[in-house]
């Protein structure tokens, strides 16, 4: 019997002397059947009588069953459970967790009424887990009770010997009883050789530091299973990753260093690395950037290549500007090209070739706005229209040239062209592109001329309706690229944070990891400090880890292997930036936050280059190093119009510059800002560089739907003495916002503004502040609660003028919702509105109304699409920023 379940059964024995009936007893069999089915009141009555009578006969004790009693069928026994037993069980959990500030009696009271239809101890656990998760509205530590139960269950059903777990994974059999090892022979042998050292280092108690959603995320997709049963603990996963990265050099010190900081939550590697480390197919890379040829043979080859990459959990970006337009002449067959209609097949492939059965396949397609099929492209994800002309599972992106933005601004003409007629436009950017574009225009080699502003409106219309296309500024990307000596960057990846050179023969790759920034905040005597030295150290560890992945990775294609070994790019990002600002009790766009933002990314960039320089001394530079900006002593911030007086002074950049000039670097690119959607759930922090979307929201797991509340906000409101159920209802009523709640001080409201309440100008400026230290780019979303052409245009132009490489990842608009979607019933809503004098809120956003105003907005408008004499100061980020 496992240790946790014995807690309950020991207490059962204390409450009553219930003895099992003989298995052949007709009454017993009937009662068990009824208990299992729990279909009628008779079940309770029969069980009650059986339990009482048997107890009386066996012990000669007049047993009075408490009023709050339920009946549990466990291993063929009839058991009596009371609220006191539940309380004792919860109390023991509190003792083991050393929790003293939570209310045992209140939790017991909330649990017991739910136990009317249970038949196993697991059901009791599930109700306690559910109750603990719901009680996050009382205190953010209640869900830790749920984690304790879940993790104890996992530990009871898995081995605390890492070798035993490894043996199970290595000796796995298929359904046909053939050998089907989950981990590789080399990994297994290494574990077997060093198991004593490993078992001394591994710390299973750290499993309990996960949040409930972190555990649920690992449980669903990451922890290894045999016959659908989990056999791996989180610490096994972290050790498996650490061993994979360093075992080939027999480097136990680096293995244990990586394990230590990974298991303590200082960083995490990307999802494919967590999925596949140590397995028979170690595909550890996150991003693949592809080019494509224009012939049918090359296109069909690309279909196969995409399927193979997606099969092994890689996200894909494909630049397809070179695909000739629909109706273009094909000399070999005297036929006509299908143009970008080929994307409907890519859409089907993405649906079929999912990522190892764990995540849907994901493809992003990039073209430039001069392509003749641009309007067809922009309609691909729309909800209306013929299904044969839609590809709603693809993600769409634009590589926008500066000349297009200039023509939109001037309300000038724009020429659409076919790449087969204008081949000199391909692989060009900046002045060279403009020169060729103007030449083709002057010669009349274009398909059609339109107002640039008409296309711009069409782009924004698609973004407002579907959230895409992404906006990448091609000239900014290439002007500031450390790979410019290799070639021109023509596309990006699935999430718009990777910008690497690729073509139909050379597919680029990137390996990612993210640093959990809140782990570097220490609060001493209520004064927060940020440990930049530790951040520097972690950046160096990750640089070496990611560099190792390049060498050990399983590559689905030679095109990916050759390019990655040649250019060796990596991507170190972050998560939990908003958590850091909350811990510092400073608003997201304050000067303190901006200073932290700059220093954090300067430190990561400095640490990454320092370690890459050390790696170059050990193994040599990457093959295409010579001729790169970094080989000439130019850092990323040297490629920007950057005021070096804004450097923190913490790091000796000139010394590092000289070391790099002397010895080079091992990696062509090192820093990025990826979304961290899944890994942020695991580590328990806010996503990436994003502000909080809401301070309270619901999240679905396999165990049900629970509320998540910003724990920093709860802590601050507890300190103010205003955290109570009424406050929770008000935050739910306002859909996660605290802006309109009267008894919250203004300084707290400023700290906990949601992304809908923070000016997008601030989001863009924060991105621009860190950009000189990000040599790839950033997954920067725009958040506009009720999108309009004017507001969206203003943001996009401001991002362009700030020199950002990514102008927009997704456009996020606020979904129409009501308070009852946040767990408040209609009567409660009416009560809140009446008590607080709130007028009924209306959420109205009609895309049709927006679209119908397009002709009115175009006339006489340039930047914000509002005539200058009607525009208020500060309305337009682009003009006034």
Curated annotation (Swiss-Prot):
Amino acids binding substrate: 271, 286-287, 315, 493-497, 675-679
Entry EC number(s): 1.17.4.1
Site (Important for electron transfer): 809-810
Activity modulation: Under complex allosteric control mediated by deoxynucleoside triphosphates and ATP binding. The type of nucleotide bound at the specificity site determines substrate preference. It seems probable that ATP makes the enzyme reduce CDP and UDP, dGTP favors ADP reduction and dTTP favors GDP reduction.
Catalytic function, reaction form: a 2'-deoxyribonucleoside 5'-diphosphate + [thioredoxin]-disulfide + H2O = a ribonucleoside 5'-diphosphate + [thioredoxin]-dithiol
Source species, domain of life: Viruses
Site note Allosteric effector binding, residues: 294, 324
Disulphides: 287-510
SUPFAM superfamilies documented for this protein: PFL-like glycyl radical enzymes (SSF51998), R1 subunit of ribonucleotide reductase, N-terminal domain (SSF48168)
Similarity comment text for this entry: Belongs to the ribonucleoside diphosphate reductase large chain family.
Function: Ribonucleoside-diphosphate reductase holoenzyme provides the precursors necessary for viral DNA synthesis. Allows virus growth in non-dividing cells. Catalyzes the biosynthesis of deoxyribonucleotides from the corresponding ribonucleotides.
Subunit structure: Heterotetramer composed of a homodimer of the large subunit (R1) and a homodimer of the small subunit (R2). Larger multisubunit protein complex are also active, composed of (R1)n(R2)n.
Protein name per its UniProtKB record: Ribonucleoside-diphosphate reductase large subunit
Lineage: Viruses, Varidnaviria, Bamfordvirae, Nucleocytoviricota, Megaviricetes
Gene name tied to this protein: RNR1
């Amino acid at each position: 019997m496992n240790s946790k379940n014995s807690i309950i059964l020991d207490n059962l024995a204390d409450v009553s002397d219930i003895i099992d009936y003989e298995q052949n007893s007709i009454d017993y069999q009937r009662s068990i059947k009824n208990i299992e089915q729990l279909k009628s009141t008779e079940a309770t009555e029969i069980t009650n009588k059986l339990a009482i009578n048997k107890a009386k006969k066996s012990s000669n004790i007049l047993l009075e069953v408490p009023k709050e009693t339920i009946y549990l069928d466990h291993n063929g026994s009839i058991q009596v459970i009371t609220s006191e037993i539940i309380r004792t069980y919860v109390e023991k959990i509190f003792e083991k967790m050393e929790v003293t500030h939570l209310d045992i009696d209140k939790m017991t009271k909330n649990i017991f009424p739910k136990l009317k239809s249970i038949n196993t101890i697991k059901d009791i656990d599930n109700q306690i887990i559910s109750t603990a998760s719901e009680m996050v509205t009382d205190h953010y530590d209640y869900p830790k009770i749920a984690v304790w139960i879940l993790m104890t269950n996992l530990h009871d059903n898995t081995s605390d010997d890492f070798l035993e777990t490894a043996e199970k994974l290595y000796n796995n059999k298929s359904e046909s009883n053939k050998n089907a090892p989950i981990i590789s022979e080399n990994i297994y042998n290494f574990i077997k050789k060093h198991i004593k050292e490993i078992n001394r280092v591994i710390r299973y108690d750290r499993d309990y530091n996960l949040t409930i959603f972190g555990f649920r995320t690992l449980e669903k997709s990451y922890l290894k299973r045999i016959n659908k049963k989990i056999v791996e603990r989180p610490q096994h996963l972290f050790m498996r990753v650490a061993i994979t990265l360093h075992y080939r050099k027999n480097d136990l010190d680096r293995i244990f260093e990586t394990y230590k900081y990974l298991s303590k939550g200082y960083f995490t590697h990307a999802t494919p690395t967590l999925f596949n480390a140590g397995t028979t197919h170690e595909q550890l890379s996150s991003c693949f950037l592809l080019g494509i040829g224009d012939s049918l043979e090359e296109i069909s080859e690309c279909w196969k290549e995409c399927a193979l990459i997606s099969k092994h959990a890689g996200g894909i970006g494909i630049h397809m500007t070179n695909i000739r337009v629909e109706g273009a002449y094909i000399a070999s067959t005297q036929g006509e090209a299908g143009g970008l209609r080929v994307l409907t097949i890519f859409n089907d492939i993405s649906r079929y070739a999912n990522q190892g059965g764990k995540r849907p396949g994901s493809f992003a397609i990039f073209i430039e706005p001069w392509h003749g099929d641009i309007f067809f492209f922009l309609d691909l994800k729309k909800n209306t229209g013929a299904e044969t002309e839609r590809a709603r599972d693809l993600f769409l992106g634009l590589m926008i040239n500066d000349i297009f933005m200039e023509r939109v601004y001037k309300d000038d003409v724009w020429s659409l062209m076919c790449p087969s007629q204008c081949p000199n436009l391909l692989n060009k950017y900046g002045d060279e592109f403009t020169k060729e574009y103007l030449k083709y225009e002057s010669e009349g080699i274009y398909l059609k001329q339109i107002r640039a502003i008409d296309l711009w409106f069409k782009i924004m219309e698609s973004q407002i309706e579907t959230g895409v296309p992404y906006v990448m500024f091609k000239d900014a990307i290439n002007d500031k690229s450390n790979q410019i000596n290799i070639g021109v960057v023509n596309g990006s990846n699935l999430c718009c944070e990777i910008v690497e050179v690729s073509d139909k023969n050379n597919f680029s790759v990137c390996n990612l990891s993210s640093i959990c920034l809140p782990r570097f905040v220490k609060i001493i005597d209520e004064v927060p400090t940020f440990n930049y030295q530790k951040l520097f150290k972690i950046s160096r560890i990750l640089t070496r880890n990611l560099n190792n992945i390049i060498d050990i990775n399983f590559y689905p294609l030679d095109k990916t292997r050759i390019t990655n070994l040649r250019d060796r790019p990596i991507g170190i990002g972050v998560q939990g930036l908003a958590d850091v600002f909350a811990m510092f009790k400073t608003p997201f766009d304050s000067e303190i936050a901006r200073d932290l933002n700059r220093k954090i990314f300067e430190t990561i960039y400095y640490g990454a280059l320092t370690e890459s320089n050390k790696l170059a001394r050990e193994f040599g530079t990457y093959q295409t190093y010579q001729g790169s900006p970094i080989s000439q002593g130019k850092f990323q911030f040297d490629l920007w119009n950057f005021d070096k007086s804004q450097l923190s002074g913490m790091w000796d950049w000139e010394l590092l510059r000289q070391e790099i000039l002397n010895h080079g670097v091992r990696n062509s690119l090192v820093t990025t800002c990826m979304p961290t959607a899944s890994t942020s759930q695991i580590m328990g922090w806010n996503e990436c560089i994003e502000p909080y979307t809401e301070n309270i929201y619901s999240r679905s797991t396999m165990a049900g739907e629970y509320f998540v509340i910003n724990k920093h906000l709860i802590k601050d409101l507890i300190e103010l003495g205003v955290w109570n159920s009424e406050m929770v209802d008000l935050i739910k009523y306002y859909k996660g916002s605290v802006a309109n709640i009267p008894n919250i001080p203004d300084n707290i409201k400023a700290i906990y503004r949601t992304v809908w309440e923070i000016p997008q100008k601030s989001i863009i400026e924060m991105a621009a502040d860190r950009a000189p230290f990000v040599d790839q780019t950033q997954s920067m979303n725009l958040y506009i609660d009720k999108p309009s052409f004017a507001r969206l245009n203003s943001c996009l132009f401001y991002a362009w003028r700030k020199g950002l490489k990514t102008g927009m990842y997704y456009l996020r608009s606020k979904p129409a919702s009501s308070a009852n979607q946040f767990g408040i019933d209609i009567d409660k809503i009416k009560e809140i509105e009446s008590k607080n004098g709130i007028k009924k809120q209306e959420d109205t956003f009609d895309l049709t109304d927006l679209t119908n105003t397009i002709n009115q907005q175009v006339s006489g408008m340039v930047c914000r699409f509002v005539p200058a004499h009607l525009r208020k100061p500060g309305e337009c980020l682009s003009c006034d920023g």
